Amino acid sequence: MGKKRKLDSKSPAAARSAAARAAAAAAAAAAAAAVAEPSSQPEALAEDPAPSSQPLGLSSEGAGERMMSREAGGGEEEEVEEVEVEEEVEVDEDEDGEGEGEEEEEAAERDADSIQALLNSFPKDQLVELLSAAALSHEDVLTAVHRAADADPALRKIFVHGLGWDATAETLTEAFSAYGEIEDLRVVTDRATGKCKGYGFILFSRRSGARAALREPQKKIGNRTTACQLASVGPVPPGGMATNPAPAVAPAPAQLALPPVSEYTQRKIFVSNVGADIDPQKLLQFFSKYGEIEEGPLGLDKVTGKPKGFALFVYKTLDSAKKALQEPHKQFEGVVLHCQKAIDGPKPNKGGGLGGLYGAGTSGGRKGAGGYGAHSHSLPGAAVGGHVMPSPVSSLTSLPGVAGGPGVNPALGQALTAILASQGGGLGLNNILGVGANGSGLPNPGASAGLGSSGLPGMPGAGGYLGGYGGGGGYGSTPPGGPGRNYMGH
């Protein structure tokens, strides 16, 4: 219960109390007047009304006191009611405080930072599922997804290969402008001749243009049948065409399996077409724009410190490596660098060299490691210090003097021909492989050192060009007890 209040003289309760006293006084006066009126009583009684009026006056005062008592009781009741009202108000205020706390918590759950932190804990598959459901249910979400896709050049840029040597930018414009507005295009040309190297890039303004162009990936451009794909996919997939002078990845045999990819390997990229005239520091600076580099460039010549046709970079984060691979073909000082994920290969053992595509590796015996398909554990690439060089590309013409040799798989000769036709000059493979300028297929002077041993192609036991075919050592074949080298002299 609350404390008793003293009634203010100006309050309604005080006014009611004063009115009650006035009414009691008026009643007493009326009673006195009635007694004073003439009656059958003696005149003496009329003259001296005091004895009879005194009791009346006392009773009037008693009535006034009783009324005041009732007024006081009413004041107490009013005070009790006011205390109860105050308690009810306090309870309502507590309930309002709890409601406000719930509203604040709900508002915090709708905060952008809170939602982002929550989504960061979700796996990618669950995020894709949630976003797909939201896009199907809400048109604005679907519009936002399409807008984000249109803003990404990786989804609008296509790579076309198999172009003729006379292809120009006008040739690509005429062939692809029908599919949508073209934002940019480029035909990659040879620096020496100015002729097309067989491939180019088209960047559409919208993703719909690229999708329309890729509905029919094979197109007749000029007198050539070409093929196109998204540039972000990476190297050309298997199944290149007979007239395709550009690179295409050779399909690996079904029995070959790659080892599990480590987290370190996922952060590593392989860059090809890196000539010896390229400054490694400038190359490092160029690839550092995609993220902080932990190691690289790896694969430099140990004597000269110059690139040997390729380079490896290891980024500190996986996101940086993915960013570097978003555009796998990069222009650097007038040269097109080809980037892709690196592959870790097995380390050499004491029993013999690694089984790579070119028989690369070291050997403690009389012969180098087996070549392509020589062992069931072989990997489709040449091993370079624990790294596996991505396998060379397939083309469809034979290497003169090699593909027709005894014990040589024609497909491998075709792959080597593709390298010579597309990138052999930039990588210096003509001299390394011992293919003369006249295309005879015979080694040039000094080519034997690059091959790891001397001998004629395909001759059993002589250490010819192709390890694993005809019983000879490969590029990694060595004299007894000597270390071998791969086809790039590493």
UniProtKB/Swiss-Prot annotation:
Signal peptide interval: none
Pfam family, one: RRM_1
The entry's keywords: Cytoplasm, Nucleus, Repeat, RNA-binding
Biological processes annotated in GO: mRNA transport
InterPro entries in the record: Nucleotide-bd_a/b_plait_sf (IPR012677), RBD_domain_sf (IPR035979), RRM_dom (IPR000504)
Cellular component terms (Gene Ontology): cytoplasm; nucleus
Task of the protein: RNA-binding protein that binds to a cis-localization element or zipcode, within the 5'-CDS of prolamine RNA. Binds strongly to glutelin mRNA, particularly to 3'-UTR and zipcode RNA. Recognizes and binds to glutelin zipcode RNA, which is required for proper mRNA localization to cisternal endoplasmic reticulum. Exhibits strong binding activity to a glutelin intron sequence and may participate in mRNA splicing. Required for the correct localization of glutelin and prolamine mRNA in endosperm cells during grain development.
Oligomeric form and interacting partners: Forms homodimers. Interacts with RBP-L and RBP-208. Interacts with NSF.
Name under which the protein is recorded: RNA-binding protein P
Species the sequence originates in: Oryza sativa subsp. japonica (Rice)
